[in-house]
Amino acid sequence: AHNKSIDDLISKYKIGGLIFFQGGPVRQASLTNRYQSQSKVPLFIGIDAEWGLSMRLDSTYRYPWNMTLGAVQDMSLIEKMGKQMGQQSKRMGIHFNFAPVVDINTNPKNPIIGNRSFGEDKFNVAERAVALMKGFQSEGLFATAKHFPGHGDTSTDSHHTLPVVKFDKKRIDDVELYPYKELIKNGLSSIMVAHLDIPSLESRKGYPTSISYNVVTEILQNDLGFKGLIFTDALNMK
């Protein structure tokens, strides 16, 4: 029944892509082939593989979490890891990895980022994110930096509520946006925008960054000069 509902989305609504959340590699590859054969325009296939395909698929390789990579001093090892993840993803027909996470983990009470972050230092985060991105993209896997403009210093989970970030624009530009600037300079393919309430960037009360013209168009595209693909975080988040 679930597979049929996806068939209908492809045939009736001409969706542009799919994201896989569970299953094994054989089933995932089979479903990808099924859906691609039904779509008149090739579908983009994405996955959250922050520490490898095993984040979502069983019987696949698992790599260290970003917190561990934050202590690795040899960037070539991180790039090599990204390259392997790229090879494995391409074999599965996956185009986008919704990674790396470039949130700077400056709030120890953060319930959702934590060990998914490279750490609390913006230079450390940016250097490792660039290495991982280069590894992905050397194999033709598009990297997607997230969660723009920065989910690191929040004390609530945006899957369940709308977190508020109270920093002023200068602090956000100096700290949270730093990794994005470095990744964009190095050829980043795509960015995922978070659902956040940031009064210093969006004056409308309770208006999420994911649909904010000022955040997405003025800051990300105009100020940072980003020309790649822009995703929002999941729309089924509360």
Residue ranges and their predicted role:
Residues H2-K12, L77-Q88, D173-Y180:
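Short, acidic/polar
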Residues S11-Q22:
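A short aromatic-anchored loop/beta-hairpin motif
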Residues L18, V26-Q38, L43, L53-M55, ...:
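Second-shell residues forming the walls of enzyme active-site clefts
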Residues P25-P42, Q73-G93:
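Active-site-adjacent structural elements in enzyme catalytic domains
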Residues Y63-Q73, S117-G119:
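A charged helix-plus-loop insertion that forms the helical arch/lid used to bind
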Residues V102-I112:
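Short, conserved phosphate-binding/catalytic loop or strand-edge motifs used
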